[in-house]
């Protein structure tokens, strides 16, 4: 197959699910080059083969850089026995994405728009605050710089609405004491690659912007002491619904098709904006018991829910390393006529093993 003309190979690759690309890239350097070619993704788009690709970001104690992985099919294509769960593997794995010098990041700084993953302001935990903005091209897996924020933020969060990135954060002004914190709200247009020329006023908002936000019903919801929401069409700030933020004590939440989902103590819930209350996600037969929500991450996976969680790896003896197993499940979501949500577990698998000393930064999806 490697002796075929490049044009023919591109045509073949464009018709193959991207889940198999990490394996194909191992065949040869020419394959790796073709799989990163812009022409390949143009062909995929013309064929209507654009798909959602799951990316997962970790930080290990071995250095300041983040490490990236993407969901794919196992290279050998076989189903292996997994005795820890008394089941056979479904053939999925998180493959390493070779990205050199990947900048620090945290949950609230990472968002995806199309095939680009944006790192807004870096990580406030792994180094000094930053105003830098970096973009990871998930086609070539190369970072490039974007226009920076106006100031370095102490805490911040970013969410996407209509291909624009809404960033809310706080920064120290003046002498830098605790009473000098101010809020900042900016909007980045991903089409023009420029920030809104005049930052949107947020002086009337009460409380400092925290590091959690979500875009629901065309509005940018930001967690503060009381919670606020920005209605961009009206250009004003309003007080948020208290119950929407009351359930999100951690980062185990995501927005899927304009619905906010959350897991707390092993129970999945979704937010009903009409009733202004959290409701239980029904179904989920076959899903194993999950750990505390601080060890769980959720992501929109093409309208389905990707659930990733950590679990202690069985001891390998006195000389064994302390490691954690990363599991992944994909759940199809369906809304019934009575407005209840049901989840159907399509598969779950042990997809990665990582050092015990790590930070599970985030899982998110790019469209390719």
Swiss-Prot record:
Hydrolase found in the keyword field = no
- CDD domains membership: F-box_AtAFR-like (cd22152)
Which ranges does the UniProt record give for the Kelch repeats? 116-163, 165-218, 260-304
The protein's matches in SMART domains, at most eight in alphabetical order, are given as: FBOX (SM00256)
- From the Swiss-Prot or TrEMBL record, give the protein name: F-box/kelch-repeat protein At5g51250
Q: Which InterPro entries match?
A: F-box-like_dom_sf (IPR036047), F-box/kelch-repeat_ARATH (IPR050354), F-box_dom (IPR001810), Kelch-typ_b-propeller (IPR015915)
Native source species:
Arabidopsis thaliana (Mouse-ear cress)
| Domain F-box stretches | 1-44
Which UniProt keywords are listed? Kelch repeat, Repeat
């Amino acid at each position: 197959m490697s002796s075929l003309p490049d044009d023919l190979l591109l045509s073949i690759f464009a018709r193959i699910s991207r889940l198999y690309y990490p394996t194909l890239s191992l065949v040869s350097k020419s394959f790796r080059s073709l799989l990163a070619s812009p022409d390949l993704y143009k062909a995929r788009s013309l064929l209507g083969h654009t798909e959602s690709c799951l990316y997962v970001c970790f930080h290990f104690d071995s250095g300041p850089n983040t490490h990236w992985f993407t969901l794919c099919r196992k290279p050998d294509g076989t189903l292996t026995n997994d005795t820890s769960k008394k089941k056979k593997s479904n053939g999925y794995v998180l493959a390493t994405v070779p990205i050199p010098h990947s900048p620090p990041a945290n949950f609230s700084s990472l968002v995806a728009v199309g095939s680009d993953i944006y790192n807004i302001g870096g990580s406030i935990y792994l180094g000094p605050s930053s105003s830098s903005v970096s973009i990871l091209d998930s086609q070539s897996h190369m970072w490039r710089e974007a226009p920076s924020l106006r100031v370095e933020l102490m805490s911040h969060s970013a969410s996407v609405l209509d291909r624009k990135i809404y960033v809310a954060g706080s920064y120290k002004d003046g002498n830098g004491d605790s009473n000098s914190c101010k809020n900042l709200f900016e909007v980045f247009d991903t089409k023009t690659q420029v920030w809104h020329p005049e930052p949107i006023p947020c002086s009337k908002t009460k409380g400092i912007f925290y590091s959690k936000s979500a875009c629901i019903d065309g509005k940018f919801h930001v967690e503060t002491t009381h919670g606020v929401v920005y209605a961009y069409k009206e250009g004003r700030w309003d007080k948020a619904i208290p119950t929407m933020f009351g359930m999100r004590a951690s980062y185990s939440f995501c927005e899927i098709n304009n619905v906010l989902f959350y897991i707390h103590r092993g129970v999945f819930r979704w937010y009903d904006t009409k009733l202004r209350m959290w409701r239980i996600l029904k179904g989920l037969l076959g899903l194993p018991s999950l750990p505390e929500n601080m060890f769980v991450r959720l992501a929109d996976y093409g309208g389905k829910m990707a659930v990733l969680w950590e679990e202690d790896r069985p001891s390998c003896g006195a000389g064994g390393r302390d490691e954690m197993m990363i599991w992944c499940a994909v759940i199809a979501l369906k809304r019934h006529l009575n407005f209840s949500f049901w989840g159907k577990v399509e598969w779950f698998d042990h997809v990665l093993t990582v050092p015990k000393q790590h930070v599970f930064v985030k899982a998110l999806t790019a469209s390719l």
